[in-house]
């Protein structure tokens, strides 16, 4: 890494609050070189609508100078159609995907150390004919990763997910010994790489009520989750036996852990978001780079109103800088 962490930020869905929270965050100081990938005219118009006194500059294909609050360096990717805040336009879906692809290329070219993503509208991207499940899956595919892990973080808690954006009925079949071992390996390795934790303590939740109640409420803990945990222990990974999820977040095992591994999206994230929604950060583990994101969606009804909080974006930028600095040690 250079003297300053180098961050590229994708501006997200142009009709949503992505531009709002990015511009709001960049009014704050950060010890980093920061560039935004988006439509510079959309960003300028949004700044005017929000009453922000910002200076924009177009970037050549190299890293920007150290960040100065109120100054925004932009890699310009034009929208195909005019943007109306709060109103989705399928014609601009390709613009959103192109901003992501541009960020990937900048990272692959080693011009940046990390990417921070503003929210996108998955539905309008798919309505345009482009297949898009989410940022996590997109970056995994673009970097050719066999597996990645979604991790959400706030001041008091880290929650990783064994499965991500799946219908609930598909979750049990998606959890295998091999998939859990892969997730545990990634969590163990990246908490060391990005956070400097030499022996991360992982609190692993069960899938079923009361962690299966000895097989009476489901056998996944006996047949899949416990064997995966035992193999992980043999590999030197510090992981608990399956913990009943209903009381897990009050247990000493979780309180003493560095990270919780939840079995599915809505098992672990409601607790984390209840503790710090709007200031939490989404991180993709298992990538050869660093990717962080906000913990909220596009909030179309808030676009250009001045009511969208930039706190999660500021936290995502701060987290990316810290991870980049830890990785360079």
Q: Model-derived features: where do they sit?
A:
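Ligand-binding beta-strand-loop-alpha-helix segment within the catalytic cores
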Residues: 152-182
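Conserved hydrophobic/aromatic beta-strand scaffold that supports enzyme active sites
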Residues: 138, 150, 159-161, 291
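FAD-binding core/adjacent interface of flavoenzyme oxidoreductases
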Residues: 140-153
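Contiguous, glycine/small-aliphatic-enriched amphipathic segments in soluble metabolic enzymes
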Residues: 1-135, 174, 178-263, 267-282, ...
